[in-house]
């Protein structure tokens, strides 16, 4: 362990990196483009996931709010934060995630379901907001079959074919703290 720290410090000093790089986290639900240059018109190298931890090499004011990231590339400062967004949430575990389509009826809470917003869940109160890994933020508005248990939610996708394509998946789920 000590050898790794010493080697990392030596490599960092050779490359001009500080031993204690500033850390930031992706705070964009739909991911964040890591760009070749500090501009929105620059090519995207890859898409970073919500909550991904990044080490900052440079946050010079001349970059106009962009950060140069260890490993190469730039991220727009509008879509990052200095605290881990998952520290502001309660991890509920790995849940079974199924999907449902339009029925023509309102949800159990009286609202009509909305794609990208509504989930059905029996173990959480109406209005509870959750973050589902790889999906994003959703809100409990409906209920589903009791036999599916507590570690389950049903994503409203609207179209039957989208639900069939989704199938039955397992994802990590966090409850957003109030």
Where are these regions (language model features)?
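SH3-family beta-barrel domains
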Residues: 8-33, 47-50, 58-60, 81-92
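Solvent-exposed, well-ordered loop and adjacent helix/strand elements within mature globular domains
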Residues: 59-65, 70, 78, 82-178
């Amino acid at each position: 362990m000590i050898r790794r720290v010493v080697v990392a410090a030596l490599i960092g000093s050779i490359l001009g990196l500080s031993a204690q790089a500033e850390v930031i986290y992706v705070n964009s639900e739909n991911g964040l483009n890591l760009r070749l240059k500090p501009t929105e018109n620059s090519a995207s190298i890859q898409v970073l996931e919500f909550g991904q931890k990044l080490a900052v090499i440079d946050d010079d004011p001349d970059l106009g709010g962009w950060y140069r990231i260890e490993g190469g590339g730039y991220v727009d400062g509008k879509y990052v934060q200095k605290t881990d967004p998952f520290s502001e949430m309660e991890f509920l575990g790995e849940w079974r995630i199924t999907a449902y389509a339009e029925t023509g009826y309102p949800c159990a809470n009286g609202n009509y379901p909305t794609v990208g917003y509504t989930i059905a869940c029996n173990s959480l109160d109406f209005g509870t907001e959750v973050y589902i890994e790889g999906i994003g933020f959703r809100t409990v508005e409906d209920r589903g079959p009791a036999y599916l248990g507590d570690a389950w939610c049903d994503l409203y996708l609207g179209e039957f074919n989208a639900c069939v394509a989704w199938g039955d998946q397992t994802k990590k789920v966090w409850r957003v703290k109030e």
